[in-house]
Amino acid sequence: MKKFIYIVISFLLVSCSSNALKKTIILSKASPNYVNWLMDSNFSIVNAYDCNNIDSILLLADGIVLTGGEDINPLMYGDSSNLLLCEAMDFRRDTIEKKLFDFALSKQIPFVGICRGMQMMNVAHGGTLYGDIPTELGDSVVHRNNGEVMHDILVTCKNYDYVSMIFPQLSI
């Protein structure tokens, strides 16, 4: 899984730029895992969560990763009823990630969201979330898998050159 995430992030950044100089990746909130995945590459890593002035780092960004983590505050998607369902929330992080997402969209900077990061992209773009899937949907949707997390996926793409760059062993 770590290798896959590294490949996806590397692919997004390499495919969107022809410049071979060291790229600056902004992580919304760094953890040792994210730093380790990117450390051996030609990336300079900036942890946005540790910055006092987000505006000062935005112009450095060659790519942005909205990382995984705690629940997004339901007030960000207009649902005060979910406040009691959500676990730990971090309003500062929510604000930072929304700003990073908006900046990436406006400047057409490559970005990727991992778990919570994908949820933040949805919320920042006006979407909503289920505060707690088992509470809101019951047991009809299996949300947690304590076993194997790998599974087959169907890839459909009009430009197979990009797919073959990520998965060279794939036969089409």
Feature names for model-found ranges:
Residues 117:
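Conserved SAM-binding loop
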